[in-house]
Amino acid sequence: MTKIIFMGTPAFSATVLEGLLTDERYDIVAVVTQPDRAVGRKKEIRMTPVKELALAHELPIYQPEKLSGSEEMAQLISLGADGIVTAAYGQFLPSKLLDSMDFAVNVHASLLPKYRGGAPIHYAIINGDAEAGVTIMEMVKEMDAGDMVSQKALPILDQDNVGTMFEKLAVLGRDLLLETLPAYIAGEIKPVPQDASQVTFSPNISPEEERLDWNKSGRDIFNQIRGMYPWPVAHTLLNGKRFKIYEGDLVEGQGQAGHIIEKTKKSLVVATGQGAISLKSVQPEGKPRMAIADFLNGVGRNLEVGDVFGQ
């Protein structure tokens, strides 16, 4: 039985860990995840999805604020594990830890060398890519730069968003890892170096990137909305106040960018640089998220055709 230290944090990682736990070839000797954090307006302390799963399986859990040079790292090395599997852990792994293992692989949610970094799924959708995927890669000191063990793609559909793609890619990553890992450990797979000329990056989304520019095409704005749902959520301004847009549809229509070109009791259509967006789910500043019909029957009832978003 191969002894593995698993490292991961979000639901994506928990799906991968779940796969390893169902495979009798692997013994998870430790789980490393990010510390519990305060989240939401109420600042409630919340554990990571990986920690929740580890607790349910009574696995040893480590949550160092910083792994490098920590007491926890020394303890992990002393476990005598065969290897490390990571999936969206959120910290760099020290060379000392990597060097102490027979193998260390990462499940990364992109088709490397494209989209190294922390937000590959967001950027794949925002950039209008036809497909996304997962790569099993060897861990090295440089971020997501290791040789590729295996890779698999799937299409991005218009109805997809970050949430749906996270779920799909988590399952794809889990299955690809279980399919690949035995042959890799046995030395039957020769990892392939990444093409340095094709490397792109996907850093965490900045606040500026969340803001919609209505001068862009409808397709670009549609992709941006989907590429930020359910987090961090795209936003614009309405009467000088922040206005979040969770969901919208790409529709035909012409008008001055950012201007309302159609309003009914159940729909609100905003012109873009090319085409238009029909808003579906929104959140005015200081209000809860709501369907567009509820918005138009409430705080948005006085909006008229010609009113402007983005200012």
Curated annotation (Swiss-Prot):
Q: Which reaction does it catalyse?
A: L-methionyl-tRNA(fMet) + (6R)-10-formyltetrahydrofolate = N-formyl-L-methionyl-tRNA(fMet) + (6S)-5,6,7,8-tetrahydrofolate + H(+)
Gene Ontology CC, one term: cytosol
- Give the top-level enzyme category: transferase
Q: Tell me the protein's name.
A: Methionyl-tRNA formyltransferase
User: Pfam families from the xrefs?
Assistant: Formyl_trans_C, Formyl_trans_N
Organism expressing this protein natively: Streptococcus thermophilus (strain ATCC BAA-250 / LMG 18311)
**Keywords, sorted A to Z:** Protein biosynthesis, Transferase
* Family classification: Belongs to the Fmt family.
Q: Can you tell me which residues bind (6S)-5,6,7,8-tetrahydrofolate?
A: 110-113
